[in-house]
From Swiss-Prot:
UniProt gene name: ribL
A Pfam family the protein falls into: CTP_transf_like
Lineage: Archaea, Methanobacteriati, Methanobacteriota, Methanomada group, Methanobacteria
NCBIfam families found in the cross-reference section: cyt_tran_rel
Protein name: FAD synthase
Annotated positions binding ATP: 5-6, 10-13, 92, 119
Record field: catalytic activity: FMN + ATP + H(+) = FAD + diphosphate
Pathway(s) per entry: Cofactor biosynthesis; FAD biosynthesis; FAD from FMN: step 1/1
Keywords: ATP-binding, FAD, Flavoprotein, FMN, Nucleotide-binding, Nucleotidyltransferase, Transferase
Amino acid sequence: MATGTFDIIHPGHGFYLKKAKELGGKNSKLVVIVARDSTVRARKRKPVINEKQRLEVVKMLKPVDEAYLGCEGDIFKTVEKIKPDIIALGPDQDFDEKELQKELKKRNIDCKVVRIKEYKKSPLDSTCKIIKKIKQMKFDDIEKC
């Protein structure tokens, strides 16, 4: 299982999802949980792309077998429903692996938590970097869009 906002898709997302799927082995199935707009606003910032569109795009990505919107409020409800063998965390996700593992154990969810390393092959390797670059650009020919 992989989770995330997936607001403006970039190569780091592809790397994360590919590595998450590889964790499960040859015939693994990757289920992706896309964060709800309310969750993104509470934890990060207002999303650029709404949750339904983000989900639609994630479903189209090659490593993804299934994708769903997360539950409002208790993020563990989705995990309890899916019962993954592995939860792959992205490098920028603010979960502490040990605390997450403790909470999973408390809820009788037997799965491994693995942090995927950072993707640094692209200067625009995060949604925030993309947003900052767009804000800095002067679009003299915006009418052509």
